[in-house]
Amino acid sequence: MSNEAYQHDHTVNPHQKIVVNSYDWLQFRDEQDHCKSKNPITHASPGVGSNAQNSDIAEAPQVFHPSYQSLVNVPSESPRPDQTSGSNPAVGLLHNAEDKASGQEEEGSQYEIQYSVFRPLHAYPTKGLAYEQLRRKEEQEQRENFNHLVSDCIEAVETFGRELERIQTGSSGSYFVYGTRADESVPVGVFKPKDEEPYGPFSPKWTKWAHRTFFPCLFGRSCLIPNLGYICESAASLLDRRLETHLVPYTDTASIESFNFYDNRKKWVLGYNLQKKKQKKLGSFQLFLKEYINADEFFHKYPLPGMYSDVKHSFHRKSSGEDINHKPETTRNLTDETEPSKQINSSPISTESEENSKFEWTESSLSQFRLELEKLIILDYIMRNTDRGLDNWMVKLIKLSNNKWRLKLAAIDNGLSFPWKHPDEWRLYPYGWLYLPLQLLAKPFSEQMRSHFLPILTSTNWWEESYQEFLALFSRDQDFNVRMWKKQWAVLKGQAFNVVETLKDPRQGPLELVRRTRCQVIDEKMQVPCCPPPVSIFKNAIDEPIGSYSTSPMVLPSTPSTIPFHAHNQSNSNPVYYDSTLHPFANKTVIAERLQIVNSTPVFTWC
């Protein structure tokens, strides 16, 4: 059997293994499906060409292997010409707008989950309507403030000439963005153009250029969709808001003009002083984090207990201001309850300020850090971040009034997330937080995290709303593909399924989560009645005897009758009429989730 025929139904057969396929191969399959969908009357086998259909010679029957895309499109209704999808003004005009709008409407107009693999628990009920309304109001305020800030930055570039400043570190072309305030020396945002991503065509980093030029076979990540990092940055922020983890700075797509964008002409004309060209680029705009430092720098100043073998931590009794009886449950789980509350002193390390030098790892600070880390672990796992190290998540120390400290984490550089398949070729891309001390990871998830995430991830309404929002976000890209989007969504839901199953067991933690079998949750479309038939139909069918007026009682008349039967048996005086000619086959398309195990594994699991 050929490779193409083998791949036709690999997402339909639940017992078949997921094989390695390339992004180019899927694009070729999409072109074939698109050509077939243009002629809804002709139904031919995949191996039969147009010449064979028009020929008078009878062809031998061939086995038809329907693809998953063709199966899900059978019950779908074609969109009306007067319906169009909304467009983001920051993105601008999109190519193939008509085909894309119709595909988006078909996929997102009706997304109702009839059967879900995310079974809710009675011990963790979902949030009420009042809480959801408050969350929507806060999110609307955040969106308005973000749009106002982006407009202010665009005005600063166009009116006041405050150009963007390229960030020298990192593997992509990223720029600091400033506002209109002249006294503001700190940037207000970070802009990452689409074409200057790590694997983009105009990345200004020479290391990526060398990879693309001299090592094309090892360049890029096959599990990610090319040039979609700016959408993934925004999607990570959307997922953060949907999960209410508050780790990712607000991020969305925007278009900005600047003279400092990377100009591809400079690498061809060396030694010639070219005049800067003003370019308008599309990318992701992320709010700048103030007073945050990278995690690797933070741990260099304040190493965690057990992080370095040459750093000794001595235990002392807690200060008199702390009361162990009022310690939260999550804090007691992180320490030994048989021992009195203790303080962990870090090694003397030079700091930038006297205030920061007073910070010491205590049981309270370790508990706060553990809670923030658990949120980061679940967020990274669900969106399957393939580039999480100690250099792209940040820590902030907040000094409280009672000589205590508060720790806050933030997740940045999320562009290499949301893969369309699990890594299954060369590298596994493990999470960077797995290299933290074992005493932080080898503990179960806290009850606070279980009570927070389980009601969200087991809510059918939450998944239906999330699908609509993520579909609207990913469809902003001009190369948006419904087939690839379904694969991304299946991987995300499979990761969330593992999170739910891990949180259901109070004995499991981060280490058990990453050891779980990889899976996907595929959305299968099915037709069900829009509403159950009226009770009067069943009652009439049971009570009405077969009449003797017809020569063939089993043959129904051609014109359905609208005369009420047994109206005198009804409790009310109004007879019940039912006309079967109105919507005789009123069905709707719903989603039935199906769990599929991923058996393929990459070669190297440590990098």
Curated annotation (Swiss-Prot):
Tree of life domain: Eukaryota
Membrane topology of the entry: Peripheral membrane protein
Domain PI3K/PI4K catalytic intervals: 161-522
Cofactor: Mg(2+); Mn(2+)
Biological process according to GO: endosome organization; Golgi organization; phosphatidylinositol phosphate biosynthetic process
Positions of the UniProt region annotated as Catalytic loop: 384-392
Catalysis: reaction(s): a 1,2-diacyl-sn-glycero-3-phospho-(1D-myo-inositol) + ATP = a 1,2-diacyl-sn-glycero-3-phospho-(1D-myo-inositol 4-phosphate) + ADP + H(+)
Keyword annotations of the record: ATP-binding, Cell membrane, Kinase, Magnesium, Manganese, Membrane, Metal-binding, Nucleotide-binding, Transferase, Vacuole
Biased composition annotated in UniProt, kind: Basic and acidic residues: 319-330
Region: Disordered, residue numbers: 73-93, 318-356
Polar residues bias spans: 73-88, 341-351
GO molecular function term, any single one: ATP binding
EC assignment: 2.7.1.67
Major subcellular location class: membrane
InterPro entries the UniProt entry points to: Lsb6/PI4K2 (IPR039756), PI3/4_kinase_cat_dom (IPR000403), PI3/4_kinase_CS (IPR018936)
Other known facts: Present with 56 molecules/cell in log phase SD medium.
Family, per entry: Belongs to the PI3/PI4-kinase family.
Subunit structure of this chain's protein: Interacts with LAS17.
Name of the protein: Phosphatidylinositol 4-kinase LSB6
Organism (species): Saccharomyces cerevisiae (strain ATCC 204508 / S288c) (Baker's yeast)
